[in-house]
């Protein structure tokens, strides 16, 4: 029996993140923001919700040792997501010269607050500076002490642990995170990375989990999602954050990696499963996406067209090599566009 690990791209996570191959996150962000924001397309995005999801993922699939290497749990006054984001931004840009928040120039603090639309009205300028200095100083200092580790509050850690414990014990999800010594034909692996090409363009992915049934020759791709909405409402998040791109891209890459392998070439990749949990309701649900082999655009319940990742990738590849100031649509129409979004009432 050959392990699926032998086909994986064996690099550490920093190497994976730094690689130039296009990922799901890049494609989905490009589709949301458009080609005029290419200059910031590859910038790392950090939000409290992403941090929480990463913490659950790490503790659940990599274990406590890996969690302790990446995160530090501290007790500090509760902050809103906006204040946390502002503090992280200030720390990222000023920590080398300012170990404390209080030494940063007020104008820079105000500028950072405006970036996150925090009391953006000009009449609140003094208040927003004062509020950030009073509320965020302790958290800023903790970020300095933490170094390369990510700071989690005690409350966040309690929620992380609750989610992990529930996922490991809930009848709907415990199978994914447990092993049966009598099922030697079942292989469960976490955080495997793969790399392939589409029409000469490098693409990459990292699976939260892959389950391989070596007897039935079936491969089950699985992803863990933490959500701010009730688990039953995941379909809205699925289309909003374009998880169809993730499922279809990852399936394509995995298929490319197994198709020429003598052992795995006859294995069949199954529908993509998303394990969804909310930190408040803590009632995990497994959502199944059967369109992961699809190659056509999709339409969501609101009528929005969800372009196939291949079309997005080709467009992104064009703009990454393009130095002009016009869109593809404008160029194709000689810079004459028709207003067509209005209809008679």
Where are each of the predicted segments found?
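Metal-dependent nuclease catalytic cores that hydrolyze phosphodiester bonds in DNA/RNA
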Residues: 1-204
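Single, functionally critical "micro-switch" positions that shape active/binding sites
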Residues: 56, 207, 250
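Hydrophobic/aromatic-lined pockets within catalytic cores
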Residues: 60-65, 211, 226-229, 255-259
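Short catalytic/ligand-binding loop motif for oxyanion handling, primarily in non-cytosolic enzymes
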Residues: 68-69, 80, 230-231, 282-284
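Metal-dependent nuclease catalytic regions and adjoining charged, substrate-binding loops involved
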Residues: 98, 105, 239-244, 249-345
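Short regulatory "switch" loops immediately downstream of catalytic or recognition motifs
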Residues: 165-175, 212-214, 251-261
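Secondary-structure boundary elements
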Residues: 181-183, 211-219, 255-268
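Non-catalytic protein-protein interaction segments used by genome-maintenance enzymes to assemble
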Residues: 192-244
């Amino acid at each position: 029996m050959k392990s699926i690990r032998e086909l994986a791209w064996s690099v550490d996570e920093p190497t994976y993140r730094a690689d130039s191959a296009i990922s799901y996150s890049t494609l989905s962000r490009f589709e949301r923001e458009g080609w005029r924001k290419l200059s910031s397309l590859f910038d790392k995005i950090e939000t409290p919700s992403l941090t929480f999801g990463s913490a659950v993922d790490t503790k659940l699939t990599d274990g406590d040792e890996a969690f302790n290497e990446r995160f530090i749990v501290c007790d500090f006054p509760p902050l809103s997501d906006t204040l946390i984001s502002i503090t992280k931004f200030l720390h990222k840009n000023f920590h080398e010269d300012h170990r404390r928040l209080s030494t940063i120039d007020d104008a820079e603090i105000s500028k950072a607050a405006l970036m996150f639309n925090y009391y953006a009205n000009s009449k609140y300028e003094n208040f927003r500076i004062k509020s950030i200095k009073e509320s965020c100083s302790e958290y800023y200092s903790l970020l300095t002490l933490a170094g390369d580790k990510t700071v989690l509050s005690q409350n966040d850690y309690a929620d992380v642990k609750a989610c992990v414990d529930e996922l490991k014990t809930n009848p709907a999800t415990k199978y994914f995170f447990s092993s049966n010594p009598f099922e030697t034909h079942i292989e469960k692996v976490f955080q495997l990375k793969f790399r392939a090409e589409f029409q000469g363009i490098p693409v990459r992915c990292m699976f939260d989990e892959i389950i391989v049934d070596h007897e039935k020759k079936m491969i089950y791709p699985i992803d863990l999602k933490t959500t701010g909405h009730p688990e039953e409402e995941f379909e809205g998040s699925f289309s909003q954050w374009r998880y169809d791109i993730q499922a279809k891209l990852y399936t394509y890459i995995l298929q490319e990696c197994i198709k020429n392998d003598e052992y795995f070439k006859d294995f069949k990749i199954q529908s993509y499963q998303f394990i969804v949990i909310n930190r408040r309701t803590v009632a995990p649900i497994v959502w199944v996406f059967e369109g992961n082999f699809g190659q056509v655009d999709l339409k969501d319940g609101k009528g929005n067209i969800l372009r196939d990742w291949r079309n997005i990738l080709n467009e992104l590849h064009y703009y990454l090599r393009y130095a002009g100031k016009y869109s593809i649509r404008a160029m194709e129409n000689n810079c004459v566009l028709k207003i067509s979004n209005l209809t008679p009432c």
